[in-house]
Amino acid sequence: MTRRRVGAAEIRRANRGWWDTDADDYQAEHGAFLGDLDFVWCPEGLREADAGLLGEVAGRRILELGCGAAAAARWLAAQGARPVALDLSAGMLRHAAEAAGRTGVRVPLVQADALALPFADAAFDTVCTAFGAIPFVDDSAAAMREVARVLRPGGRWVFSVTHPMRWIFLDDPGEGGLTAVHSYFDRSPYVEQDEHGVASYVEQHRTLGDRIRELVGAGFRLLDLVEPEWPAGHEGIWGQWSPLRGRLFPGTAIFVAEKPAR
């Protein structure tokens, strides 16, 4: 692992390849926690059924970005919404199709880049993602503008990401992850690379201020910033997320924003 600058083409190639290759392992490790028909915002286990961050969903046209296996989109369909699930990875969309067969809940699946959404202006009432797309694109401000374009005036944009303060720590769920070792202001991405030094996984860091400026710059109004607390009785570990760290500082930030009505 290293922290270094990576070009846009290399980022796209790396992350598409990573999620295609890792899709089976990811679902094997996390599929039970995420469910086939559920909307889980984060490793802390906050569910949309309890949080209600999207507001009313019945009858709404909802786009799920970076949908993975599209459990959230299927849950939305079960609540009466009209969702579309989008992901860059064919491997993850294969799992989405398989889960649709298991549950009998089918939603449109689209393979596309979050920086070039294949939809008309104002096509959706709501756009959402749980840890999808935004941390993995080269230009997340441009992704915000694309979301604003496809969202109708008055529509809501809700997304969760790793809490920016987590980037000062090592990616370690244990004691080693309690000591600050990185500058919060170093925006160099987290990069995993092969033996030839070619990036195989890239994740971007932005500060809280960066995220707010991206939203405002795209024309959004921030309604809420949710930092889910680690729930009592939750002893699961997901990558760097753990009870030890979760009880001390936040691991997830959920931004709730609105495109102002004209």
Which functions belong to the PLM regions below?
Residues 125-140:
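A short SAM/SAH-binding and catalytic strip from SAM-dependent methyltransferases
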Residues 1-58, 71, 92, 156-191, 249:
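Conserved class I S-adenosyl-L-methionine
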Residues 141-156:
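A short glycine-rich, Lys/Arg-flanked "PGG" loop and its adjoining helix->strand segment in the class I
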Residues 115-126:
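A short acidic, Gly/Pro-enriched loop at the edge of an enzyme's catalytic core
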Residues 202-225:
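Short alpha-helix
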Residues 161-169, 195-210:
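Acceptor-substrate binding/catalytic loop of class I
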Residues 60-116:
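Class I SAM-dependent methyltransferase SAM/SAH-binding core
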